[in-house]
């Protein structure tokens, strides 16, 4: 109603909460929800919404230490949030230093795009549309030196050194990474790998989508 009749713009998250591991993926349930308005015409249900995927990238990921710790603890047991943790994370996400922030308004999802999936049953249709949105979001992601530094460290390479980052930028990232040492965990190398993944996974996603 707000979009098709009142002509208003509406921002909708691609999933319940921002990903913690750097692998952004659209929840198929969101696509299913969009289709409820016109069950008899799944193409028009989405095309008339004029969906424009938005890609947001940060130089410094918000709450990166906390995300890494939560993922680390979730490997062996269900992570139980402390009282007030959600509010604290929201406030930290708003106020913490993010460095360079870049927003890309990606190509709109058109009726022509959707027609490619017209013959698919509901579940497959939702999955393919979600993948299309992910493809455009990843293509619009602005990678920063931190992403390439983390990728090189994680995989023991120097693939991006020089072209994508300088020694000074790497030293700054290593200083940030060193703060992980204050967390007392049984497997610090696993925690570090998870932390590096938060920054390096977008590199794999972007390169996969662009090749």
Describe each model-derived feature in a short phrase.
Residues 1-10, 17-211:
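Membrane-interfacial terminal anchoring regions of lipid-handling membrane enzymes
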């Amino acid at each position: 109603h707000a979009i098709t009749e009142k002509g208003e713009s509406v921002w909708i998250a691609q999933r319940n909460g921002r990903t913690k591991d750097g692998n952004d993926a659209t929840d198929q349930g969101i696509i299913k929800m969009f289709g409820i308005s016109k069950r008899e015409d799944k193409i028009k249900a989405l095309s008339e919404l004029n969906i424009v995927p938005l890609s947001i990238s940060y130089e410094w990921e918000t709450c990166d230490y906390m995300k890494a710790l939560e993922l680390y603890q979730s490997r062996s047991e269900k992570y139980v949030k402390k009282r007030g943790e959600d509010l604290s994370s929201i406030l930290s996400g708003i106020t913490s230093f993010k460095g360079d922030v870049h927003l890309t308004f990606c190509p709109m999802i058109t009726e022509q795009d959707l027609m490619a999936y017209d013959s698919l049953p509901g579940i497959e249709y939702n999955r393919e549309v979600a993948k299309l949105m992910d493809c455009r979001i990843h293509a619009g992601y602005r990678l920063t030196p931190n992403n390439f530094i983390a990728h090189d460290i994680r995989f023991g390479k120097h693939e991006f050194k020089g072209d994508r980052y300088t020694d000074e930028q790497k030293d700054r990232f290593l200083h940030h990474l060193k703060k992980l040492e204050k967390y007392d965990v049984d497997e610090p190398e696993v925690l570090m790998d998870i932390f590096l993944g938060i920054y390096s996974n977008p590199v794999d996603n972007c390169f996969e989508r662009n090749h």
